[in-house]
Amino acid sequence: MHDHSGGDPAGAAARMATEIVGLLHDVDPTIDRLAVDRFPYPVIDALRSHGLRLSDADAVFLPARAVKLPIELPYLCEAMTRVDGAVARLEQAIAPGRTEAQVWSEYYGDLIATEGQYVCTRLFQSGPRTFPYFQECSERVLQAGDLVCLDTDACGFEGYSVDFSRTFLCGDGPPTATQRTLYGRAREQLEHNAALLRPGIEFRELAGQAWPVPDEHRDSRYYCVGHGLGLAGEFPNIPHAIEGVPYPLPGVVEPGMVICLESYVGSRTAGEGVKLEDQFLITADGVERMSTYGFDDRLGGS
């Protein structure tokens, strides 16, 4: 508002509010409530000065966006195709002696080269930086034997997002026993929870039956069981069930939803962790796994 007001933000806000109120009254002069997605504060103040009651539009938009229309599905599939290619480029670039940033740039560069749009985060870590999770890529130099974690978090095509995660092993050597254990548990969590997904299952039921995270990994587990996806990470964000605490999120998994199931299994003792995640489309009679990128065979993938 300040950047584009010609030096008069209050006046610009007043004019914008007057125009909005006029459009509302053209529909129905009795309208006195407006759901707002995002407005500059001066416009919010100006709208309220007209007597409008403002509310958060997310309550309307997010449930509506959660269920995809058939016309949206080809866009989601095309986005996945472009991101898959970029992940393959990154996996090929993983090698001792390269920095995390150098390897991650191969992922971003390939996405752009195929006219993908952008990556929303820099969640790419190696070695001791894989624990705890949510560390951005850095200038750390990859070493042989490192675990290397990627979360795609990409806007792949025409505004539609792709969100899956893979963990790779750097170098040509075998993994350690601890690395195989962490990977095996992360894969078990992912597949266990994937088997629960179905149209009609309540969020509460999904969380309650989710893979029981062992005590040694509980403090560093991923913050939710899974979440919706579309134009970004979206509703529903499915929290873990906590014994003795009423489950906070009502609702059910519906056909047309895209759900990303999360897994992170880390070890404070070993100082490393494994991040896996897959993206699923809920259909009328089942579930389709949208992310089919392979798992690292050396760590126990297939």
Regions found by a protein language model. Name each.
Residues 1-302:
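Active-site neighborhoods and metal-handling regions in enzymes and metal-associated proteins
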